[in-house]
Amino acid sequence: MPKISHSALRRTFRELLATPTCVETASVFDPMSARIAADLGFEVGILGGSVASLQVLAAPDFALITLSEFVEQATRIGRVAQLPFIADADHGYGNALNVMRTVEELERAGVAALTIEDTLLPAQFGRKSTDLISIEEGIGKVRAALEARVDPELSIIARTNAGVLPTEAVIERTLAYQKAGADGICMVGVADFEHLEQIAENLTVPLMLVTYGNPKLNDAKRLASLGVRVVVAGHGAYFAAIKATYDSLRAQRQLTHSTDNLSATELTHTYTLPENYVAWAEEFMDVKE
């Protein structure tokens, strides 16, 4: 299998963003899954922050994974990847200066693009887990990310949560990040096409949506017409791998267990112990849901 340079994969991703089509990402979480995704013809993969936390820490998505741990996993994928892949870089692991370090490390790891979100992470004492940083801080992070990259083909995508703010505020944020120079805008929490149309109306950069399979947004042609080029429907491949591992090991031990009929998502919940983290956050941090 011929090797493809990281810069070439980044150009491929930019070419994808320039087309009038919308594609769905493959969830890639290790070198094998990246090779499988490329062999099956996926145009782009994504290393999700939540999936990396599960893979590295067996922990839920509470911003517990460190930059070095995330970069190590991205590097393993980048070493063999035959398709461009996006790194979900969460909040950039700190302030704007931390964002610069994040970009430097992930660029060396071989990612084609990375998302930097404006969620207030990690969760702060006495704050809601969905709180966002100010627009000004978000702009600073976008500008810092652009300054830090060496390869101009690396795409910097600004991410925000469209589900926790009034539509007018979402429009203000996305336009601000576009003006700051982001190569694309990623959104989670878009409710339906009417919501998307309102936000996308004045945006000219390519859009990326995290839909988690929302049936109200299940129309690739319509998404493409509104500027959406990449959709993350979820990380089904990873959860299927967890379920397959459980089923195989259970069969090997010839056991019947109370968790036998649980779905992949339920199994993940069982073994990551999220109730512990929720309780600790409430006890030690007074985090509001």
Swiss-Prot record:
Cross-referenced InterPro entries: ICL/PEPM, Oxaloacetate_deCOase_bac, Pyrv/PenolPyrv_kinase-like_dom, Pyrv_kinase-like_dom_sf
**Per the UniProt entry, what is one GO biological process?**
pyruvate biosynthetic process
- What residues does substrate bind to? S50, R159, H235
EC number(s) reported in the record? 4.1.1.112
Query: Any idea which GO molecular function terms this record carries?
Result: magnesium ion binding; methylisocitrate lyase activity; oxaloacetate decarboxylase activity
**Reactions accelerated catalytically:** oxaloacetate + H(+) = pyruvate + CO2
Which leading EC class covers this enzyme?
lyase
Cofactor note as given: Binds 1 Mg(2+) ion per subunit.
Residues bound to Mg(2+) are D88
Q: Which UniProt keywords apply?
A: Decarboxylase, Lyase, Magnesium, Metal-binding
What are the names of the required cofactors? Mg(2+)
Family as reported in the entry's similarity comment:
Belongs to the isocitrate lyase family. Oxaloacetate decarboxylase subfamily.
Q: What does this protein do?
A: Catalyzes the decarboxylation of oxaloacetate into pyruvate. Seems to play a role in maintaining cellular concentrations of bicarbonate and pyruvate.
Share what the entry says about its subunit structure, partners included.
Answer: Homotetramer; dimer of dimers.
Cite the HAMAP family for this sequence. OadC
Its recorded name reads Oxaloacetate decarboxylase
User: What is the source species?
Assistant: Pseudomonas fluorescens (strain SBW25)
